[in-house]
Regions:
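Low-acidity, Ser/Thr- and Arg-rich intrinsically disordered low-complexity segments
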Residues: 2-5, 10-18, 24-29, 34-39, ...
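Core beta-strand elements of the Rossmann-like FAD/NAD(P) dinucleotide-binding domain
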Residues: 61-63, 297-306
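N-terminal Rossmann-like FAD-binding beta1-loop-alpha1 element of flavoenzymes
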Residues: 64-89
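Glycine-rich FAD pyrophosphate-binding loop
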Residues: 83-102
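Active-site substrate-recognition segment that forms the wall
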Residues: 106-107, 112, 116-156, 284-287, ...
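Rossmann-like flavin
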Residues: 147-265
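A conserved short coil-to-beta-strand element within the FAD-binding core of flavoproteins
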Residues: 230-232, 236, 278-292
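C-terminal catalytic lobe of FAD-dependent flavoproteins
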Residues: 353, 394, 398-471
Length: 471
């Protein structure tokens, strides 16, 4: 069997910092943005144009398993499959873990079972969509393209559907902490995993009572929650301003002090175990009876027995090519970082009414979150970053300006459930995308389910709720 010999060996443990967008870049297109199909990356410099493809002599290489996407889901799947005796190649034009896997809030959130769409959100949706200063917004230029997705999102926000979606998500999340602790021990990365829980803060009594209703639903599905009054909240987080509402503490939740470094360790271990990580794009995908053919941005053609699509927000481009017209959209996620401010909070704290986390990380405080619908092509929205900055000044008036900012892309399904499924063409193509806000949380479980699909063994949970053709 031939092996791909395309890429330079990289230091996966340090390269992810290049994905940061400086504050001065907030009004221009980020250089790491994968701007259009073909699925490529400007910084890597490979663009799968027809002109370039025509200039390169096509070579056909044969592989066992190709995983498209070197985020945390793709890499944990690669590591799992390689250890099952399969031969795995990972393709991604960007450095491993440099997308949403890098820029998230760092929570391993067994409690994060509530879908984005809910009856409460549905009531507020018309006003939220046009509020550039709120926690849920939409880029106006993307409205027409988003209408079909928004219609499905609204439908999935109805009470019965929202409840079913919560149950489906809970089936994947409730042992997330134990899975990550096992993986971290294997990676000798236990020092990156913090066991201090996570906290929701409600700033007034009305929001606290609404939050209590949500927490009861989560408790019914097995989430361990402690409801706090303002005094108890102040004991846990003494540097936060006093609130009139209360809090919800999730004692079993874990957090990661440096998500980018953790994913880099997974990549390094995968390579040490024999996985080949190749910095290349996939521009075309076609399924045949016993194999899948991938055309790469450099003109090479690869055939594989099986392909796993784990390309996050960029997965739709490839799924569409084999007839799986999945309703995947992009939530544009932002973060700000404040160097030297990690002591402001002791654990990840979510300002519930604003939809963002304050997460203490190695040498810095990361403020991450909110939802902006609008695709991967547009530059960062200054209003989104200003929203985070202003809210942080409300909480900590003495806080200095942010050290840096970042924009990344979450893969979002209308029902907030991931797609973990065979393709319509069969087991030659497996999907593992659409994890929304909880890709980090669900990566080890998803890897186990991907392995079951690839190997035709019984999955740990039934996969009907996550099939690609459920819409």
């Amino acid at each position: 069997m031939s092996r791909l010999r395309l890429g330079l060996q990289r230091d996966w443990l340090t390269s992810v910092d290049s994905a940061m967008i400086p504050m001065s870049a907030c009004t221009r297109r980020p250089t790491f943005d994968r701007l259009s199909a073909p699925w490529t990356n400007q910084a890597v410099g490979r663009r799968g144009s027809r002109a370039k493809t025509a200039e390169v002599a096509v070579r056909v290489l044969e592989e066992d398993i190709v995983i498209v996407g070197a985020g945390v889901v793709g890499l944990t799947s690669a590591l799992t499959l390689q250890r099952l005796g399969r031969s795995v190649v990972v393709l991604d034009p960007s450095p491993p873990g440099s997308g949403a896997s890098f820029g998230n809030a760092g929570t391993i959130a067994d409690f994060a079972i509530a879908p984005v769409g809910s009856p409460a959100l549905l009531k507020q949706l018309p006003s939220l969509l046009f509020d550039r200063q709120g926690p849920f917004s939409i880029r106006q230029g993307a409205m027409a393209a988003l209408l079909p997705w928004l219609a499905q999102f609204a439908w999935q926000s109805l009470p019965a559907y929202s409840a079913n979606n919560m149950r489906a998500i809970a089936a994947l999340t409730l042992d997330a902490g134990a899975r990550w602790q096992g993986l971290a021990a294997d990676l000798e990365a236990g020092h990156l995993i913090q066991n201090k829980g996570c906290l929701y803060v409600f700033n007034n009594e009305a929001r606290y009572q609404a939050g209590r209703r949500d927490m009861r639903l989560r408790q019914a599905l097995g989430v361990n929650i402690e409801l706090l009054n303002p005094g108890e909240l102040a004991q846990l987080e003494p540097h936060l301003p006093q609130v009139e509402g209360g809090g919800a503490f999730f004692p079993d939740a874990l957090s990661v002090s440096d998500p980018g470094h953790l994913v880099g360790l997974i990549a390094a271990r995968a390579e040490a175990d024999g996985v080949q990580i190749v910095p290349e794009s996939v521009v075309r995908l076609s399924a045949q009876k016993r194999q899948v053919v991938l055309q790469l941005g450099n003109g090479q053609r690869v055939t594989a027995r099986q392909v796993v699509i784990a390309a996050g927000a960029h997965s739709k481009f490839l799924a569409d090519q084999v007839g799986d017209l999945v309703p995947l959209e992009t939530e544009r996620g932002y973060h700000l970082e404040y160097d030297g401010e990690s002591d402001r909070v002791r654990r990840p704290v979510c300002a519930a009414e604003s939809g963002f986390y304050m997460s203490p990380m190695a040498g810095r405080l990361r403020v991450a979150g909110t939802v902006e619908l609008g695709g991967v092509k547009a530059p960062p929205t200054p209003d989104r970053l200003a929203f985070l900055s202003h809210r942080m000044r409300d909480i900590f008036p003495d806080l200095k300006a942010a050290s840096r900012s970042w924009l990344g892309f979450r893969p979002s399904m209308p029902d907030s459930r991931p797609v973990i499924s065979e393709s319509r063409v069969g087991r030659q193509i497996i999907y593992a995308f659409g994890h929304g806000h909880i890709g980090l949380t669900l990566a080890p479980m998803t890897a186990s389910l991907v392995a079951a699909l690839v190997q035709s063994t019984a999955p740990e949970v039934p996969l009907t709720d996550y099939r690609v053709n459920r819409f």
